Amino acid sequence: MVKKGAMPNFETIDDYIASQPKEAQKVLQELRSIIKEAVPNATELLNYKVPAFTLVKEGKRDQQIMMAAYAKFIGFYPFPTTIEEFSAELKNFKHGKGSVQFPLDKPLPKDLIKRMVKFRRDEILKDWR
């Protein structure tokens, strides 16, 4: 018996997206495309049972960005330093230390997201040197 509210285990990001309401599916697919456009070699996986993208080869958990669907928004988790770097541009979005909420009923800020993803990737690569 599954606990009420327990998140199922998904095999793939496609499974995760397919399990969401139609409105969330559309935004998740769009966000996924934006991430892959920004970093084409990002590896997709599930982490904490939600879609994650490793931005560098064999990247650890803190070298990934994640996304998750909620009732009224998509949570995007690019890392605290990324949120800090783009805080002025995120002023119209609810955001915390390492996350930002993109409402389902508003267009995604495609250019901003691409720049955030590239910033995080470049930050990771710089730390590796």
Where are these regions (language model features)?
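Charge-dense, helix-prone N-terminal extensions
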Residues: 1-129
